[in-house]
């Protein structure tokens, strides 16, 4: 299993959170592109609160262009840019689908072209989940907690 850090991880102690995640047997990708079973590439980017994170295009250049590329990027705020890169699938979160109605409409305005759900855009497929957590108060209205299971099949 693989993970990337989100904005709330940077509010606390990203190093301690990374250690805890890795102690649970999950690899945290921090500006890394790694081959998986010689079949596809997985890129993990930290949240944009990390002011030293690399541009996505630099990470994509580290992959084999003949193989599929999956990108984990916490925020969906670069979807339009990523749709022009050779990224086959991007998975993101952060927005919580607005968490409390009517904030989902605000999220749709801020995170264009995709703040929640699935959409094929440009070169790739994009998924933004509402996740299982919350921001601020532990409450949701009009947005369900969720974990997506994405099955990827080859040709």
Language-model-derived ranges and their functions:
Residues 1-155:
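Soluble catalytic domains of enzymes that build or remodel membrane lipids, polysaccharides, and related
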